[in-house]
């Protein structure tokens, strides 16, 4: 018998006591402030790890993930038991209403909120409505807490490193998070009522188990009753000789409250090799005895029985795995606890789960008269009360793959559709990303503008954030007005004027605001004179004159009159240098000539919460200047919002226009870098992807964006994007000849296929669609 297994079984032994209350049936003796618990004679700690896109990866990527997961299993401590738990829980109505649905505010936009909430509710109803959490619980026998704490510090570093290689990560849970797991399991439907503060509980003399225990717990022969629900624990009795890596994901897809646990006990390699060699000697002895019996019967040509030959071959292969293929011997068992409202439903669910197992040639059986031990094994206490272990190698354990597909369901996020694999809602909070800026890319008709408008609508209806749009094709005006925003038409014939020299409080954020305005004037002048025509003398004059016209304004503490372009040109004309006269002549067209739309004081209220800059009628001559001036105006607004504590969303449609001109591309790139520090997120969209990819600035912005929506792509663009963004061929199939609203999202390092189909029978769809026949 293997000593490690004997020691592990011994550590699980505990004197039997009849529980006198529900609290006493929960096998936790002590909890410590750092999240370590004492259960029986063992200490345990739990980590949460994230799902990864295993099911969506190419065969080569899956092999790499499988190898990395094998490495993680090989790194598990041999003197401890590791439990991998997949926790399926249904999202209850109260949670859904609080975390996803929009609250009405008693204004004229409530009708839109009600319509959007109907869409979200319908989409949630179409999904399996599951939230899936994944945990690792490590339990170890130690003499005291200090030894246990030292052990878990080492395990924490190993798990973080090995699961980090999988891009999953492992985060240790504190008492609040660990107790919440059990509270939500024992008291389904009361998730929002959980509150626990260790210091407060100690002060009041409360038992921590009071906060998580069910109202009642009664164990029967083949099921248990718990607080008005019934449950049952199953265990994996018989393994197939070959198991597909999708079995665990199929079981965990079951649309009911369920916990699936895999207990793993690695054996030290030297001990495992000795055990297997001993088994081989035993088999060889059996074969020798069989041959002696045959020889005694004068049967010298008989072949060794197939069973013995097969057993010898498999055992030698197992030894070869241990000694040459970096495999570990692992004892493992699988348990499932599932819940239902009635016994009839429970029996039906049990049959369904057993059928899923039989599809993989695996037999799940009910634990009879062991439901309590089974429950304590399946839940992430760190206990292993069921002894139905199976001897596996690292690879055969890794086939019980806990990974499937990543879910994005951030609190306070924006709805972007549903996960194409799991059908769960995709809700992303871009404010939590390292860089909240993003791109929406797709050919004409792929749903690019609709996606932008949908995000704008969601933000407008569910938050107090400010929204600013740059609209080159006059597609956002109707939606802006419906959301009570302001549409500002920027053209030579428009009554609206923008003063590019406006400065708001907070402009510059630590930088020299006059120097920034000087850079703006240099870009405007060079666009009029031609790229490369602005020399060092010109730049010095521009910088000097810009500083001069702001002198009185700065001296007054920002309370005086803000200068305008005519003030700047007059200052230039006063300079004695010949280059000053060249600048004055070059600026005449847009200061005093027919294109003088920016030579006035700003004459509209830009402080509306939602603002759309309409550039549709802007001619080619002034378009580069207009793009820079609008960005400068937005930068002013973003700076003011930052001081006021307001978040700003900036949406730029047809962003390729910026990349056509050197200075506007550079200005956009500066805003892209600067706005993150200003509490602002930019979103740029374009259908002219090939043209954007010719710009090094655009490529740099794309590669450094944490958020991307890729819709249907042209063949030439797919190859370039796959190379630039490191997206596999399998993943790119989700943007190849797909319908509008279908595609890929890249959120941080996660790549998720999505479907975003909005109902066409509502007012919101008509406001957001760009299809003429759907208006």
PLM features: residue spans?
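P-loop NTPase motor domains
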Residues: 52, 59-78, 89, 252, ...
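Conserved lysine of the Walker
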Residues: 448
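Hydrophobic positions on the alpha1 helix immediately C-terminal to the Walker A/P-loop
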Residues: 451
């Amino acid at each position: 018998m293997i000593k490690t297994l004997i020691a592990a079984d011994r550590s699980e032994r505990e004197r039997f006591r009849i529980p006198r209350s529900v609290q006493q049936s929960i096998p936790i003796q002590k909890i410590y402030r750092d999240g370590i618990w004492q259960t029986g004679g063992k200490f345990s700690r739990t980590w949460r790890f994230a799902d990864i896109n295993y099911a969506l990866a190419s065969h080569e990527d899956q092999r790499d993930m499988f190898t990395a997961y094998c490495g993680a299993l090989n790194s598990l401590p041999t003197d401890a038991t590791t439990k991998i738990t997949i926790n399926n829980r249904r999202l209850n109505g109260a949670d859904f209403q609080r975390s996803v649905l929009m609250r009405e505010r008693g204004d004229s936009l409530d009708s839109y909120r009600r319509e959007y909430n109907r869409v979200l509710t319908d989409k949630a109803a179409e999904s399996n409505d599951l939230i899936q959490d994944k945990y690792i619980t490590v339990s170890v026998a130690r003499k005291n807490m200090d030894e246990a704490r030292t052990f878990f510090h080492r395990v924490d570093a190993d798990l973080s490193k090995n699961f980090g290689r999988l891009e999953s990560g492992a985060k240790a849970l504190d008492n609040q998070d660990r107790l919440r797991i059990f509270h939500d399991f024992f008291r389904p439907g009361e998730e929002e009522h959980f509150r626990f503060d260790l210091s407060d509980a100690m002060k009041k003399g409360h038992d921590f188990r009071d906060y998580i225990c069910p109202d009642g717990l009664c164990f029967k022969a083949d099921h248990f009753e718990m607080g008005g629900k019934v449950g049952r624990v199953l265990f994996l009795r018989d393994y197939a000789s070959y198991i597909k890596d999708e079995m665990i994901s199929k079981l965990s897809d079951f649309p009911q409250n369920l916990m699936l646990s895999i207990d793993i006990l690695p054996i030290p390699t030297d001990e495992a090799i000795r055990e297997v060699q001993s088994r081989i000697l035993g088999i060889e002895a059996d074969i020798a005895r069989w041959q002696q019996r045959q020889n005694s019967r004068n049967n010298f040509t008989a072949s060794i029985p197939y069973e013995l030959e097969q057993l010898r071959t498999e055992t030698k292969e197992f030894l070869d795995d241990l000694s040459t293929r970096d495999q570990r011997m692992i004892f493992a068992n699988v348990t499932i606890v599932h819940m239902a409202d009635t016994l009839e439903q429970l029996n039906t669910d049990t049959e369904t789960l057993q059928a899923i197992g039989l599809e993989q040639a695996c037999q799940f059986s009910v634990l009879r008269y062991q439901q309590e031990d089974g429950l304590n094994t399946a839940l992430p206490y760190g206990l292993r009360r069921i002894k139905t272990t199976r001897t596996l190698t690292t690879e055969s354990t890794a086939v019980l793959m806990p990974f499937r597909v990543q879910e994005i369901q951030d609190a306070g996020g924006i709805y972007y559709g549903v996960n194409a694999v799991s059908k769960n809602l995709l809700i992303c909070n871009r404010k939590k990303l390292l860089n909240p800026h993003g791109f929406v890319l797709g050919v004409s008709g792929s749903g690019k503008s609709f996606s932008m408008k949908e995000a704008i609508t969601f933000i407008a209806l569910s938050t107090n954030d400010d929204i600013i749009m740059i609209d080159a094709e006059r597609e956002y005006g109707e939606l802006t007005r419906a959301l009570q925003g302001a549409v500002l038409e920027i053209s030579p014939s428009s009554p609206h004027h923008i003063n590019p020299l406006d400065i708001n409080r907070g402009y510059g954020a630590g930088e020299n605001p006059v120097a920034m305005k000087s850079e703006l004037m240099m870009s405007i002048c060079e666009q009029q004179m031609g790229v490369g025509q602005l020399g060092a003398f010109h730049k010095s004059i521009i910088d000097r004159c810009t500083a001069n016209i702001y002198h009185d304004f700065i001296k007054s503490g920002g309370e005086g009159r803000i200068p305008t372009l005519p003030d700047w040109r007059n200052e230039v004309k006063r300079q004695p240098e010949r280059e000053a006269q060249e600048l004055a002549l070059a600026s005449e067209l847009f200061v005093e000539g027919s294109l003088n739309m920016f030579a006035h004081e700003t004459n509209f209220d830009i402080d509306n919460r939602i603002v759309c800059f309409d550039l549709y009628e802007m001619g080619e001559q002034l378009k580069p200047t207009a793009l820079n001036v609008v960005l400068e105006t937005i930068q002013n607004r973003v700076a003011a919002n930052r001081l006021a504590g307001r978040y700003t969303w900036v949406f730029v449609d047809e962003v390729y226009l910026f990349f056509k001109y050197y200075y506007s591309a550079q200005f956009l790139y500066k805003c892209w870098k600067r706005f993150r520090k200003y509490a602002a997120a930019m979103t740029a969209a374009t259908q002219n992807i090939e043209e954007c990819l010719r710009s090094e600035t655009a490529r740099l912005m794309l590669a450094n964006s944490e958020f991307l929506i890729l819709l249907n792509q042209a063949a030439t663009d797919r190859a370039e994007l796959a190379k630039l963004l490191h997206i596999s061929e399998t993943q790119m199939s989700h943007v190849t000849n797909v319908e509008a609203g279908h595609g890929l999202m890249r959120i941080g390092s996660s790549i998720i296929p999505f479907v975003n189909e909005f109902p066409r029978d509502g007012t919101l769809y008509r406001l957001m669609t760009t299809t003429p026949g759907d208006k």
